[in-house]
Amino acid sequence: MEDTQVINWEAEEEEVEEGPSEPLGCNLQPVGQLRIFSSSYGPEKDFPLYLGKNVVGRMPECSVALPFSSISKQHAVIEILAWNKAPVLRDCGSLNGTQILRPPKVLGPGVSHRLRNRELILFADLPCQYHRLDVPPPLVSRGPLTVEETPRGQGGTQPHRLLLAEDSEEEVDSLSERCVVKGPKTSLTTVIPESDEEGPSPAPDGPGPPFAFNLNSDTDEEESQQPGAGEAPSAAETEQPKPVTTEIQLIKDQCPVKEKHKDARVKRAASNGVVPVGAILERSQPAGEDSDTDVDEGSGLPRRPAGAHSERAQPCGFIDSDTDAEEEGIPATPAVVPVKKRQIFHEVGTESPQAPGVAHAQESPAGSDTDIEEGEAPRTVPLDSSRASMMIDSNMDDEEEVSAALTLARLRESQAVPWNRDAGAGDHRAQPVALLDQSQASAGRDSDTDMEEEGLPLEKRGSLPKGPADKAHPEKSQPPLRGSDVKVEEDERSPGVHPGRSQASATVDAITQVEEKAPPRPAVTLSEQHQVPVAWTPQTDVEAEGDPAKLPVVHPAEARPPPAGGHEPDVEKNTSLAASAGADVRKSQLLAEGDAGTEWAVAILAQDRALGAGAQSVSARAQVGQDLPLVSREHLADVAVDTGAPGEATQTQREGTQALTERERELNVDRTIDSGDNRDDSEDLDLQATQCFVEGENQSPEAVPSMEDEPTQAFPSTLPQEPGPSCCSFQASGTLDEPWELLATQPFCPRESEASEIQPVDTHLEARGLCPSPPRAALPEQHPESPEPLGSQGGGRQTVEKATGTPRETAEGPTPERGPLERATKEPPSEGERGGMGEEGLPRGTQDREEKQVLAGVTQRQESDRTVKSTSTDGGLESLQVEIETPKEMQENEIEKQTLARDMLEREAEKPVAERESEAGGPEVKVPEAVQDRGPLRAEAEGTSQDQKGQASNLTPEPGAGVGYLQGLASAPAAPRSQAGGGGEAPVSPRRQQRGDLNCKMPPAEKSGVRAAFSPSLPSPHGDQESPEACLPPEPPEASAPLQNPLPSQSPKHPAPQSRLSPPPPPLEQSTPRTRPPQSQESPEPPFSSELDPPNPEPKVRPQGSPPLSPIPLEAHPTSPTDQAGSPEPTSRAARGGTHRSFEVTPMSVVPTALELQSSTSADQPVVPKPTLRAPWGRTHRSSVKTPEPNIPTAPELQPSTPTDQPVAPEPLSRATRGRTPRASVKTSEPVVPAAPEPQPSTPTDQPVVPKPTLRAPRGRTHRSSVKTPEPNIPTAPELRPSTPTDQPVAPEPLSRATRGRTPRASVKSPEQNVPTAPEHPQPSTPTDQPVTPKPTSRATRGRAHRSSVKTPAASEPLPSASTDQPITPKPTSRGRAHRSSAKTPELQPPTSTGQPVTPRPTSQATRGRTHRSSIKTPEPVVPTDPEPQPSTPTDQPITPELTSAATRGRTRRSSVKTPEPVVPTDPEPQPSTPTDQPITPKPTSWATRGQAHRSSVKTPEPHVPTDPEPQPSTPTDQPVTPKPTSRATRGRARKSSVKTPEPAVPTAAEPQPSASTDQPITPKPTSRGRAHRSSAKTPELQPPTSTGQPFTPRPTSGATQGRTHRSSAKTSQAVEPTAPDLEPPSPIGQPVTPKVIAEGGQNRILRSSRVGAVPGPTPPELQCPVPTEQPVPPEPIPRASCSRRPRATRKRESLTAHVGPDPCSAPPEPNSRSSRTQSLSTTPEPTLPQLPEAPAHAPQIPKVEAAGRPGFTLEPQPKATQKRKRPLAPADSPPLPKRLQRGEVPPKTVILEEEENPTARPGREEDAVIPEPGKRKRDQTEEEPRGVPSRSLRRTKPAQESTAPRVLFTGVVDARGERAVLALGGSLASSVAEASHLVTDRIRRTVKFLCALGRGIPILSLDWLHQSRKAGCFLPPDEYVVTDPEQEKNFGFSLREALSRARERKLLEGYEIHVTPGVQPPPPQMGEIISCCGGTVLPSMPRSYKPQRVVITCSQDFPRCSVPFRLGLPVLSPEFLLTGVLKQEAKPEAFVLSTLEMASA
């Protein structure tokens, strides 16, 4: 069995193809396919099964070589006696046994089992699926094919293409034969002319038959052109070699081009399937595209499009367009229109020109057909695909005519087309593109993948040639690839089978690409050609896809392929198959032969490819796989679904993938190349799967099957995309055997398949429990990813996906689905006709297999995905989001930028790379995970990835792609990879990653994950979505679902699965979905963190988390699943994160640790995030994921970046990017690891980590620290850097952050990403946070934040979005705060825990923070570590990052994270957070509750902590302390504080860090830190801030400034100080500050002040300075410092804020810092604001500040007291208290640190009043916080201004000038509302950020404020620049100034406990963020008891959920209660009550 040889992927396959080719093919031609689903071993892969005995074993000589440790040398034998007989499976006495999954059956030695089509098999722990291929029939055709081969051989030139035309005809014939294609054939011919017209080439080839040629020609030319070969044949040939060369070149080229093209293609593909083609065409030559389009459109559409297919076409088209790839597949079926198809093929061929075209041309007959089909198809497909409609139309026409035939054709075409298309053009470049496309196309990702794949493909292509050559030497000779392809097709068609196969190989390559590109179409193409293509595709796909996506996809496809092989196409398009039956048969035979072989080969190839590509792919695949998987699937789905979005997503993904791939490639390149060639690398195997594809060349045939699969898969991918239907379908698929067949015929099938695939995967996964869930998530995520991307796209996408999927699905689905169904129905016949039966079976089998594979893949992918998802999701999401946002393009730019950065990073990362690589590998490996050390790394990476993913995703992501991306970059290499993996594509890295990540990330980051994801902002919602926004927040699960929105959607759709999936990551993903996945993914990261922290953190987190968990739980649970910790989600997250993370992390961590530290970071970060995230838990978690990721990535990324970046610069970029990226990336990157390595420092580095590390590190991180520490070191420096970075970020970040923060956030998103990165990154935490932040945001939004969190990716994205938005910020805010809170909580929790510890943290934090930090610090580290680390890290980290991030996110997260750290603070903050939550309380409550409860708990803890820790007293005190400002502080503070606090905390930590941190936060952090700074400041802040801090006002001002400044200064100083850290000490001192407590209020403050004074020493510097500046601050600071802690804590937050103040002196710096902070804040002002506002909010605060300043302070205290009282008031507090306690407890838990800290702090802190206050304070704080916030804000604002360290956040506007002004004036860009002190916008808008800022009472200013301030050289008083928008004020009947005034006086929702149902818009996470910012408490679940001021906000669709509230008499209100109420600052529930009548009527 050549099959065995196949193992030699390339050579073997070639040989196989070649040799086998010669044989008529039965032999040669695979009769079945064994799809190995993606798993921890690698991406999905298809192995062709030939007649005779196919040995499955570990030995290379085995037909199905599975080089995995669990597989025996000769594990089992699959004996196929005849193509029409069921294969017999026998176990060969393997050690781990062989089992049949459905029904369950264990095969004992000697026991025989007859395999049914699509039966799921488990070899040891490797899930596979058998697909029957319908090969034989095609044999006859093959003869001609063979002939074709000759032409091909001879031809190799375009002219030969004519042959193709002939072939096409023949093919058509075959098709016709099979299907009625003949008529279509004619049509085809006719169509072809159209094609011709379309394609210039065609004209030359004018003749009808030649048309095919023409098409080919056209394509060829195009391709040629593309390749530059100029002539198709030549080109093909040349290209072929070129491909090889080009491959690499392309890879490079393609990377760029890819990027470019990819972008274009992606975009286009995304937008249309076309893109891929377009890209290819574009790349190749527009003509091709045109051709394709024309053909497709003209031909196809004109032809029959009009026909019913119009409809289909339309849907297809639309879907096609939208889904394009997916749809494409569907369309492809239509495309099948054999005639058209042929035409298409030709065109495709043309398009593919290169190999396919040429091959096709050469192949002419069969080849031609195929080629044409392929070529045309590809081209067409791409176009068509892009615009499946066209194709579909055509196809449809034909399809309608010959629905079956069409399907087949379509399939074939699709496959072929994509294949060819890519192959031709892509063959060389296109192919890779195609591959990429394919992968991407698969969904929209095709493009991405394509690019990546392209690159891979190139390599592969090189391989391909081999295969093709083998197969069709002539072909080979000719550009075999193409020729090969052709040949294969030919072969397939006829004896040409071989050629076909070869062709397939070549074509496959191309096709794969194309296929991927136009997966839907590919299906068609696939059918005929797709066999080959399929095989290829899978291979390529796998490889390209990162395997994952594709893998899953591919595998699905592959899985499908096998069936589809012959049937795969069918499967893919069962319809196609059926349609293609004739062709299919040919193909089938071919396929069978090829398929089996190919499949087999493919599988192997896939594996090999994975290996080879693996090397590349590994990363890519792993990454991609991971990422892609998610993406792939998701993307696929996403893309497919969202074409546009998908495109973006795809792009993102693609980018990610590509990047990944690239990186991977780089990484793996050796491997890839070698591996590629040596597909053997087992290691690569994993990758292999991915690589396999590459290898697939030889395996071409197999590949073909694979490809078929692939296309099918693509389709499946697509399908998965359509999880809903698809899912159903998928299952249906199984179910639908016959129907399936029909379905198969229908694209639907594939789609279904896809969906099914997804679902099954989902289910499967779920069933499997595979974590892959994330992948599943992918599935869901398909949605998820989609979500990610989708999500990113968010709801839209999800929607799209869902919608699309629904729409898409709907559109596609409906149409597609419906269409497919209908189509299927229609098609079925043909399929049936076609032998759909068998085929159908196969298809179904394939599908099954696919699904299985998908499952496996998904699973794996999920993991990957998870990672990716996270990343992807996150990233994707984010990416998507961002991408979506703009990001796409922007992204691209950014990508480039990122690429640079990445490169830089990469370089930098390089070192990390290795490690990172490992790490990356990890993610990437992820798949392999083991592979490489990746194990740990992988774990880490994976974790990271995952985490990242989670995080990322980046968000991934993605989210945070940017960040992640960057990070990824940094990490990149590894991380990216990881990230990429996670992020998806970091590896691919640069570009891809960038793009992907970036995209992803971007989206996440900028993007998302979110992202993820992707993601929400755009997706935000969804993006935030990411799940995030999604709903994630909503409820996690639910929210998640919503969040998931897409996810949920999916989730919903899939929920179950998703859920199931979810549970695994997906759940996360799903539920948390995003978050979770991220979390999950992130988790890992968190684990990182955790791990790092793990112990503590984890526990801490966990504990804390736990509470958060609670809320989280659901999320958690997803998380749980993910986390598993589930409930504990936080825990989970924490745990999970920690645990998971831990464990995941652990390994990861470990690695990371070392690695990372990162881990640390990661952990930390993640932790942070996690905490944060977790805290946010849901969000958090998501965040977490995100966060972590961010965190990590952040850190790492950042880190890396930082590190690299530390490079800061890059980092900035990175960070920025990474921020986002990181986030996303980070997310992925998260990888942190890389970060870790570096990063950490960097991030942790920066972020906190570093500092944190320092501090935290020391402290929490200590451990981390440790790791980190060093890092810290760095960090310090870097951190510092961080600071800078942070700051940097700040700067950049600012930019970024700003950008990111805002802009970016939005658009920037990317930047944001960046920003986030920076901040975020810092954020990292932030991101995390951010995410968190976002989360916060989201959460703030919380929902949003949450979402954000989730979003994180989203956040990230959102981040961007959220982030951006983050606005969400709110999220951040909220989240930040909320998040913070939430996150906080969780974070808190963790943080709390940590944070809580935070408490200690506070204490610690304060103390801890400071002390702790300082002293505790260590402990903290410990604890913090735990939490802290988490917190610390997170917090700190976050903080630091958080800081930055933290600041921003930081703030938020920071808070959160920080928070965590602060979290505690937050907590306190949480309170703050809560506050943040603001609601903190509420939120806490609410969320707190919800979380609060849990959060509360958490929150409490948090608050508590803060309180407690805050020293509670501190916090509380502080908190209460005005810190309450806390309130503000708290909330604001919390948030800010929180953030800040965290910062403080962190700072604290950081601070200690302080120095570092502080410093770290230091400024940079400042940014972050501001937060960080906070941290730093914190320290100082702490100190000052603290003192001041609270002074918050000062802080604000001071704080802000101070804080900021301080931070800055402090930072600096602090740094010193922190050093002082001590400051901390002061803190401690301050701490003692008991007075603090006392002072607490005044005294505290005062004390603080005084203390500060004391502190001043150190502080003084900054503090002092600031103080002076801040004046109050100073004192405050000092006191604060002293108090610091507490205050700090409390104040911390506040302090932070305040701190900031102190910075004043520093201020200047601080400004910087603040800037940073601001920056962080993004809004500088905001920060200020927040600070200010917050401060103001607290008037008390203010006073506080004053206090700090002392005057106020009394006041503040007073207020604080009041607040405090309030707080007490807030009973929540109590809970908080308890929580606090908990926190305290946690402290213990966290304890350790915390405890220590706690002890210290606690005592002091606690004692500090705190206690009493705690509860109270907490609440108070919370409340106050909220209120405070405003107050603070307000105050802050003033001070801030004064303080000069405003943390400015932008919403609705992207003002690079303004961002620069902020940074130049020493302010920072806030990443979330939570950490912002000023919100800058151009008009009144009801965005989450705007409402959160208004709720917090922070100044909402016009752009003129910044411009005038820039002119004045300092921040001008905001009062004169409040936004004026008479029109809107009139519309809404309110006055903004009055509303702000009321918000500062009192939190609008103080005392309110609000539950938001999942269907509400904005999503619950965002609503939660708003609620938190307004002082309300978010109830995570439906209240079960009555309580005054407890209300439920719902919408008509959720009325059924509101029976309980109605029964209880709880007011059930419309969302306008919040939206309008917050805008007017009037709480009038009675005016918005929804009556039972309305409900009933609804």
From Swiss-Prot:
The modification Phosphothreonine is found at residues 4, 146, 219, 293, 323, 370, 449, 512, 1146, 1187, 1228, 1269, 1385, 1399, 1440, 1507, 1522, 1541, 1563, 1579, 1593, 1634, 1754. Residues 1-22, 139-159, 185-387, 419-585, 642-727, 747-1843 are annotated as: Disordered. Residues 1137-1580 are annotated as: Interaction with the PRKDC complex. There is a cross-link at residue 1744 (Glycyl lysine isopeptide (Lys-Gly) (interchain with G-Cter in SUMO2)). Residues 1-150 are annotated as: Interaction with CHEK2. GO terms for biological process: DNA repair; DNA replication checkpoint signaling; protein localization to site of double-strand break. Keywords: Acetylation, Cell cycle, Chromosome, DNA damage, DNA repair, Isopeptide bond, Methylation, Nucleus, Phosphoprotein, Repeat, Ubl conjugation. InterPro entries: BRCT_dom (IPR001357), BRCT_dom_sf (IPR036420), DDR_Transcriptional_Reg (IPR051579), FHA_dom (IPR000253), SMAD_FHA_dom_sf (IPR008984). The modification Phosphoserine is found at residues 168, 176, 195, 217, 291, 321, 364, 368, 386, 389, 394, 403, 447, 484, 494, 502, 580, 617, 619, 773, 786, 945, 989, 1027, 1062, 1080, 1381-1382, 1538, 1575, 1774. This is Mediator of DNA damage checkpoint protein 1. It comes from Sus scrofa (Pig).
